[in-house]
């Protein structure tokens, strides 16, 4: 074997001797089981155990550890010197109960019973309990015994350390007389020797309530102390279980709240992502490209209407405004739409008819046209002038719209209205 390992083992054993509570750690349970398998017993060092307990306070105890602690507490209670007086239930059969008979006892039987009672009392005084028991068994065999007879035999059975039979006779006595104080007290003694402190406490309290006996005070005090310990221990277990359940419910509630919060967060993130995607798709819109549409105007134009349509009178001319549109549309594009002859006379001071479109429709892809269409003020201005022609002079003299008018004159629309576009 490795000498260094042996030295380490010696040091470990020495530390265990100084503080045996080390062996109570879960990781050393195998070593603790090994020691106990050879009959060894590990006792807690209170200071060391409390210190170790405080160090591991953040760790939760398992159910097995709690059960081990409870078993150790019970073992410590078993070492109580007061419990050395406890006796075990007897294995022998209980003495027979009285037979069921009809009618009343004869005078001879009554005389015999009285004689047996006197003999039994003398035997009890001389502590000849076995012989006294035989006398009471014979008395009960006649039938119809009183509650007192059963109580007397129960007292003898208790002296013979037969608590089970004693309890049975006391119960029979109470069935005959529920107010028999002696039956309660004797049965309380039997329960006390069996270590059934709760039953002993109930019977002793009831017996002393009916007929108080100061000679039983010491036993009554012992029973009360034991009962109090049992009650407190049971109350402690109940409170501990309730606290355990409460912590469990709180833990489950925290999990549910955390899951709910996480779900809400994911829901908000998904909505935010969907809104972002929607905004991105809307911002991807672009203006239509007119490239390739009607290059150089519509070739050939529309065939003219025979005779042409009478020209519409122009809009009333404004001083400094656009020149009047002369007569109707001329032939326009070759083979195109016939000019619309102007209305004779037109409106006084009005604008002449719209001249024909030389070369067809205006080129929508020209720089001037694109600049006009990209200017929102142009559409607003045109809409306002169509609803109120008097605004033409206002827009023409407004420096804000000067550039629009320049582009309009240079565009094909300006040519349509009599302006010559700049080359």
Curated annotation (Swiss-Prot):
Domain spans labelled STI1: 361-423
Region annotation Disordered: where it falls in the sequence: 46-82, 260-301
Ranges annotated as biased composition (Basic and acidic residues): 46-60, 264-276
Compartment(s) of residence: Cytoplasm
Leader sequence segment: none
PROSITE patterns xrefs: TPR_REGION
One family name in Pfam for this protein: HipN
Entry keyword annotation includes Repeat: yes
Highest taxon above the source species: Eukaryota
Classification via SMART domains: STI1 (SM00727), TPR (SM00028)
Residue stretches of biased makeup (Acidic residues): 61-82
First and last residues of every TPR repeat: 113-146, 147-180, 181-214
Region called 19 X 3-4 AA approximate repeats, residue ranges: 292-362
Record keywords: Chaperone, Cytoplasm, Repeat, TPR repeat
GO cellular component term of the entry, any: cytoplasm
GO molecular function per UniProt: Hsp70 protein binding; protein dimerization activity
One GO term (biological process): chaperone cofactor-dependent protein refolding
Chain's role: May play a role in protein folding or protein-protein interactions. May act as a co-chaperone.
Listed name of the protein: 58 kDa phosphoprotein
